[in-house]
């Protein structure tokens, strides 16, 4: 069975398998939508002020997605403000830096996501406000709607009101109908209602904004030919000359412009185009897409049904990222619901959706001739760059009045209110009909190759060779010439369209593309629309040769390489690329790097995808959906990308699918927690192809690794290499791992954690240093068990660096970083990048000490711990400050994050250089009490998703167990304050995994558990309280804990389970005796090994068994042999103690455990003599 057919049949099963999960997600989404709509009624300015949530209007006077449609034909009228906007970094004289081709070297960073209110904001580099903003984007992505929204928002006082006094909107397709205009007439035409005399308007040109929508649509060249003729605002000029003079700054040079266009190659249309700010529209945000689908339908039940259907189909969900396609999908579903039959949509391409739309909308059986005429009209307009047609144009093509009336009623055509002209509902729709015309014109055999040549030459003349595959008309042609496309067209037009003949047309188009052109996203889009296996295999095979650089990019040299680099900014691009590489037999590995990080090098021939925009659950869903069918792919590297629980679920589902043959999986630094390990363990048991799994730099803890061990014990597991952070595991778990290795000689468990020394140079920023450090660490071949540390240590180029306690009561600590490099502390989540050896002091502070003196709480929300850091000036080139906002789920912009500095003269808010999941990055920082805050509106405080932790403490009193359960934001200063408070009353913490889902401040949760538990109170509120304040908790009385108990936390509103833990009697270790106050004030506490050094040297009689237990854990081969070489037991112990000077506390804990196993009576005797206090494990 062909793979494309196989995938189509599989779609139904996907919908069933994911149905229940999607239902849960849908109802959560609906509640969020309804809550947002309620908020908008009370605070309509919220979106523009802060850009966190989309806005939906449902009033009759508002415009729909494509405002020229008759309002009477629709029951929903929306505008949307949460289109994703990507500002490109394009220096003067450069081309488009965000490449759309494969290259043999790493692409430069292309830009960042911005909000609509930032369009005319200061440039990050120059801090100058742009006068020209170019809005570009794919067909149907929402450029025109965005332009109209800017005008409307300005009129309503929500946007740029202080920036501009007058805003003029022009549709270039309509403007091109005017032959001549004066500047005064142009301004009058751009206003809904005249607001002031022309001389008053022109008196402040710096306060004028001209919006030109669709600047590339008309066939004109806007050259500034005769600037001296445009000095008089009352003198008429050809429209293209007038616009060219405006854009060329010959007249009104201080005025600002906003242009929308499909292409960035505007120099051929506007030769005198000045330096601009380029912003690309990437389509719907996830939340906006859900709102649009849900609110499209008048009845809520239909909206829910449509949303569930789209969410259950990863391909359809991705296609709906484009607003125009989303409208087509909703329209098709609405027609099916109205007709009362089965409601289903299995279309995999935009072309297939368009064909479905026509079959449901137009009564084709009675209108085949008229439909052909409509296609001819569309084609003529495309070739001549016309989108408006007169009645005579329609008659010339043979369209009668009845047919025009039907096309108007169905919404395919629309009549312009301001004139007697007609247009297609959307330019994309006109291009689709034009593509059908090409095929119909070529359907008569008498034309043969000559007709094909004529069609292809027309396409090349219209779009150019270099941009041929970017044109929607060409992409639709590829889709229509597919097997399914031709079959549907034959039904529509009741004619025969021989497949072999049509295939020739495709090869004609491919042959006319620019020779030696690099493989580009446009070509991949065309191949995706066609989905023919033979064509895909042939073309993708040809693309594996030499990659030639863009002629405008002198930094990319011609290289033969086995690595292909490509930037993907949207889920649509991600879907297209991952679909096409299935047919690249030589492409064995795939690597996805977020925000340009280098990742961890896989050696097989691979493709590296770069993503400068946030990766959402929808992104992971389509990526792993395509992964199911890629039998060629053997390696997948997702290192450095934070993965949600849902994302790991999608990954694991893909890996156990029969078509997936993945052998190597790298998930280094992906934010994995113990909860994820049950999913990974199931993969180890079910995925027989997996040979290598790297899970380093994740907080898996003992519980997570134990789950992995269950999967490793399964006979179906064929894993050969497992990499883990062994330094953070207990001796018992490490022993369990060693036992697994002994029982399975093919399995190797390690932790590559010893990089070579790396000294940063002046040319490396903090990202380069961090990347280099990671790569060196990964490439090292050192024994992983030679170095162990704790979560309180700072991990750097040479391993762990101990943190010293300076003043315990003040929570003041000191760390002496020994050399240049990047250092990370797992417990505080602080990162430092330093250029030389430096001593850093860190004090935990309470926000309440500083916030009460400022109005910050009204406009900002605390989203991270507050530290007072002191370091030598210039030694620290970057600091990573932790925050607990979930970037993958929040609607907040990264520009809303600020670092609050509390200095002697007051508070300063600094914009971080970068915002990453869990961190904000400051380059060349100055230090003072500092922490991360988020700019919000008060009503949005409860809509910010955060990461949280659960803390469980227990105390055993006369065999009765009492538990304290906390639910707090992931803030180390709060955790430390709770630890200290609980320790006063001899409560001991039990480590359990945190909640998987993101939670919301102010939400309430119900605590429950096994029978016979007394819980007070049963309700907990998740709130942020300063570390100096009392934290909320539930007290749980267990009684005599003879068996395991289960604890659960559920959302009070939905009763959805958000966390559960199983407590076993073995989790309760005897509490340590209270330590004297004098000891508490000491800088550090003596370990059992150091307390009893003299006794241990004298009384350990069997040293070799002790050494055997330490071999591979604490002692490497050289150290092991050096100790054994000593003559007497006393000398061996002295040698061992000499080596222990460099050991961390974790290493000493392992020594203590080994000593208890080999000399239990000696350990008990020493404990009794010291009063029973042991500071070993």
From Swiss-Prot:
Q: Where is this region: Disordered?
A: 1-20
Q: How is its activity regulated?
A: Activated by pathogens and other damage-associated signals: activation promotes ubiquitination and degradation of the N-terminal part, releasing the cleaved C-terminal part of the protein (NACHT, LRR and PYD domains-containing protein 1b, C-terminus), which polymerizes and forms the Nlrp1b inflammasome. Nlrp1b inflammasome is inhibited by DPP8 and DPP9, which sequester the C-terminal fragment of Nlrp1b (NACHT, LRR and PYD domains-containing protein 1b, C-terminus) in a ternary complex, thereby preventing Nlrp1b oligomerization and activation.
* Span of domain FIIND: 794-1077
Return the LRR repeat spans: 632-652, 689-709
Location of site Trigger for autolytic processing?
Answer: 901
Mostly located where?
cytoplasm
Q: Which GO terms describe its molecular function?
A: ATP binding; cysteine-type endopeptidase activator activity; peptidase activity
In this chain the NACHT domain maps to 131-440
Cellular component terms per the entry's GO annotation:
cytoplasm; NLRP1 inflammasome complex
Stored InterPro entries: CARD, CARD8/ASC/NALP1_CARD, DEATH-like_dom_sf, FIIND_dom, Leu-rich_rpt, LRR_dom_sf, NACHT_NTPase, NLRP_HD2
- Annotated site, Cleavage, chain positions: 927-928
Classification via Gene3D superfamilies: Death Domain, Fas, P-loop containing nucleotide triphosphate hydrolases, Ribonuclease Inhibitor
Question: Does Repeat appear among the keywords?
Answer: yes
Region named UPA: 928-1077
Q: What induces it?
A: Up-regulated transiently following acute injury of the sciatic nerve with a peak after 44 hours.
Q: Single Gene Ontology BP term?
A: pyroptotic inflammatory response
Read off the CDD domains from this record: CARD_ASC_NALP1
Where is region (ZU5) located? 794-927
Taking every annotated instance into account, which residue ranges of this chain make up the domain CARD?
1087-1170
The record describes its quaternary structure and partners as: Interacts with DPP9; leading to inhibit activation of the inflammasome. DPP9 acts via formation of a ternary complex, composed of a DPP9 homodimer, one full-length Nlrp1b protein, and one cleaved C-terminus of Nlrp1b (NACHT, LRR and PYD domains-containing protein 1b, C-terminus). Interacts with DPP8; leading to inhibit activation of the inflammasome, probably via formation of a ternary complex with DPP8. Interacts (via LRR repeats) with BCL2 and BCL2L1 (via the loop between motifs BH4 and BH3). Interacts with NOD2; this interaction may increase IL1B release.
Q: What is known of its domains?
A: The CARD domain is involved in the interaction with CASP1 and CASP4/CASP11. The leucine-rich repeat (LRR) domain may be involved in autoinhibition in the absence of activating signal, possibly through intramolecular interaction with the NACHT domain.
Q: What does this protein do?
A: Acts as the sensor component of the Nlrp1b inflammasome, which mediates inflammasome activation in response to various pathogen-associated signals, leading to subsequent pyroptosis. Inflammasomes are supramolecular complexes that assemble in the cytosol in response to pathogens and other damage-associated signals and play critical roles in innate immunity and inflammation.
Matching PANTHER family, A to Z?
NACHT, LRR AND PYD DOMAINS-CONTAINING PROTEIN 1, NACHT, LRR AND PYD DOMAINS-CONTAINING PROTEIN 1B ALLELE 2
- Please state what the protein is called: NACHT, LRR and PYD domains-containing protein 1b allele 2
């Amino acid at each position: 069975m062909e793979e494309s057919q196989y995938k189509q049949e599989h779609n139904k099963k996907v919908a069933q398998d994911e149905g229940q999960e999607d239902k849960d997600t849908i109802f959560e989404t609906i509640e969020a939508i309804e809550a947002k709509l309620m908020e908008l009624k009370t605070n309509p300015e919220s979106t523009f002020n802060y850009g966190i949530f989309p806005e939906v209007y449902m009033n009759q006077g508002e415009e729909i997605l494509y405002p020229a449609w008759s309002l009477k034909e629709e029951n929903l009228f929306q505008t949307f403000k949460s289109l994703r906007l990507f500002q490109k970094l394009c220096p003067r004289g450069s081309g488009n830096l965000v490449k759309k081709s494969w290259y043999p070297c790493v692409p430069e960073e292309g830009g960042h996501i911005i909000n609509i209110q930032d369009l005319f904001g200061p440039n990050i580099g120059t801090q100058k406000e742009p006068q020209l903003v170019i809005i570009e984007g794919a067909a149907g992505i929402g450029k025109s709607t965005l332009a109209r929204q800017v005008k409307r928002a300005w009129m309503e006082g929500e946007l740029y009101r202080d920036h501009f006094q007058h805003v003029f909107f022009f549709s270039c397709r309509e403007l091109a109908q005017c032959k001549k205009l004066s500047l005064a007439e142009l301004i009058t035409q751009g206003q809904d209602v005249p607001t002031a005399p022309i001389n008053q308007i022109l008196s402040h040109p710096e306060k004028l904004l001209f919006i030109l929508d669709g600047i590339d649509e008309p066939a004109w060249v806007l050259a500034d030919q005769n600037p001296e003729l445009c000095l008089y605002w009352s003198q008429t000029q050809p429209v293209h000359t007038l616009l060219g003079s405006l854009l060329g700054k010959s007249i009104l040079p201080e005025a600002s412009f906003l242009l929308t266009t499909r292409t960035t190659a505007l120099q051929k249309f506007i030769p005198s185009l000045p330096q601009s700010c380029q912003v690309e529209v990437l389509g719907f945000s996830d939340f906006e897409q859900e709102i649009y689908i849900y609110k499209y339908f008048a009845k809520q039940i239909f909206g829910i049904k449509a949303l569930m259907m789209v969410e259950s189909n990863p391909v359809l969900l991705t296609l709906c990222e484009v607003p125009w396609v989303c409208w087509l999908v909703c329209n098709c579903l609405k027609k099916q619901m109205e007709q009362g039959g089965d409601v289903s949509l299995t279309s995999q391409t935009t072309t297939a959706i368009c064909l479905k739309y026509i079959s449901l909308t137009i009564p084709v059986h009675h209108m085949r001739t008229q439909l052909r005429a409509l296609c001819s009209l569309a084609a003529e307009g495309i070739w001549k760059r016309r989108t408006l047609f007169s009645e005579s144009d329609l008659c010339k093509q043979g369209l009668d009045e009845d047919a025009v009336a039907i096309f108007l009623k169905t919404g395919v055509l629309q009549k312009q209110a301001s004139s007697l002209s007609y247009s297609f509902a959307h330019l994309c729709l006109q291009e689709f009909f034009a593509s059908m015309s090409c095929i119909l014109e070529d359907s008569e055999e008498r034309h043969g190759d000559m007709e094909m040549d004529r069609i292809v030459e027309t396409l090349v003349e219209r779009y150019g060779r270099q941009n041929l595959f970017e044109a929607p008309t060409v992409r639709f042609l590829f889709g229509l010439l597919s097997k399914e496309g031709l079959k549907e067209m034959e039904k529509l037009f009741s004619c025969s369209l021989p497949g072999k003949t049509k295939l020739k047309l495709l090869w004609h188009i491919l042959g006319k593309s620019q020779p030696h052109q690099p493989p580009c996203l446009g070509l991949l889009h065309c191949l995706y629309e066609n989905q023919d296996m033979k064509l895909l295999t042939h073309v993708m095979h040809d693309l594996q040769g030499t990659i030639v650089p863009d002629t405008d990019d002198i930094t990319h040299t011609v290289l033969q390489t086995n690595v292909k680099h490509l930037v993907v900014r949207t889920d649509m691009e991600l879907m297209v690329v991952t679909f096409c590489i299935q047919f690249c037999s030589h492409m064995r590995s795939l690597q996805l790097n977020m925000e340009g990080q280098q990742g961890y090098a896989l050696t097989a021939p691979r493709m590296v995808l770069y993503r400068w925009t946030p990766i959402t659950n929808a992104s992971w869903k389509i990526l792993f959906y395509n992964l199911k069918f890629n039998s060629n792919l053997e390696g997948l590297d997702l290192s450095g990308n934070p993965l949600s629980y849902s994302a790991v679920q999608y990954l694991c589902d893909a890996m156990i699918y029969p078509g997936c043959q993945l052998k190597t999986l790298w998930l280094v630094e992906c934010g994995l927690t113990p909860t994820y390990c049950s999913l990974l363990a199931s993969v180890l048991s079910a995925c027989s192809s997996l040979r290598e799994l790297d899970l380093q730099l994740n907080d898996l803890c003992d519980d997570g690794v134990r789950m992995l061990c269950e999967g490793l014990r399964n006979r179906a597991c064929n894993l050969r290499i497992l990499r883990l952070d062994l330094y953070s595991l207990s001796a018992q778990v490490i022993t369990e791992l060693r036992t697994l290795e002994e029982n399975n000689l093919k399995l190797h468990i390690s932790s590559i954690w010893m990089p070579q020394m790396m000294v940063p140079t002046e040319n490396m920023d903090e990202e380069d240093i961090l990347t280099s450090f990671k790569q060196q660490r990964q490439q090292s071949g050192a024994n992983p068990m030679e170095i162990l540390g704790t979560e309180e240590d700072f991990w750097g180029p040479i391993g762990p660096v101990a943190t010293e306690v300076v003043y315990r009561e003040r929570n003041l600590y000191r760390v002496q970083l020994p050399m240049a490099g990047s250092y990370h502390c797992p417990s505080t989540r602080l990162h430092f990048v330093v250029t030389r050896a430096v001593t850093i002091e860190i004090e935990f502070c309470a926000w309440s000490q500083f916030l009460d003196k400022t109005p910050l709480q009204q406009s900002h929300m605390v989203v991270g711990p507050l530290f007072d850091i002191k370091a030598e000036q210039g030694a620290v080139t970057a600091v990573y400050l932790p925050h607990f906002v979930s970037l993958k789920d929040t609607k907040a912009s990264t520009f809303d994050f600020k670092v609050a500095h509390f200095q002697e003269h007051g508070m300063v808010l600094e914009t971080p250089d970068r915002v990453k999941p869990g961190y904000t990055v400051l380059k060349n920082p100055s230090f003072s009490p500092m922490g991360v805050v988020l700019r919000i509106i008060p009503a949005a405080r409860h809509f910010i998703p955060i990461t949280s932790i659960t803390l469980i403490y227990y105390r055993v009193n006369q065999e009765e167990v009492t538990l304290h359960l906390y639910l707090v934001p992931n803030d180390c200063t709060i955790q430390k304050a709770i630890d200290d408070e609980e320790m006063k009353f001899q409560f001991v913490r039990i480590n359990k995994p945190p909640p998987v889902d993101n939670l919301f401040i102010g939400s309430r949760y119900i605590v429950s558990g096994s029978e016979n538990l007394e819980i007070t109170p049963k309700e907990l509120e998740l709130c942020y309280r300063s570390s100096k304040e009392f934290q909320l908790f539930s007290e749980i009385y267990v009684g005599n804990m003879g068996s395991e108990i289960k604890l659960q936390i559920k959302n009070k509103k939905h009763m959805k389970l958000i966390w559960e833990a199983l407590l076993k009697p073995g989790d309760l270790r005897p509490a340590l005796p209270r330590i004297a106050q004098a000891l508490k004030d000491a800088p550090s506490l003596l370990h059992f090994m150091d307390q009893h050094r003299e006794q241990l040297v004298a009384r350990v009689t069997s040293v070799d068994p002790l050494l055997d237990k330490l071999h591979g854990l604490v002692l490497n081969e050289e150290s092991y042999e050096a100790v054994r070489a000593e003559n007497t037991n006393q000398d061996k112990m002295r040698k061992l103690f000499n080596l222990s000077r460099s050991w961390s506390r974790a290493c000493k804990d392992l020594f203590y455990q080994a000593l208890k196993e080999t000399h239990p009576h000696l350990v008990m005797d020493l404990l009794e003599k010291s009063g029973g206090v042991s500071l070993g494990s």
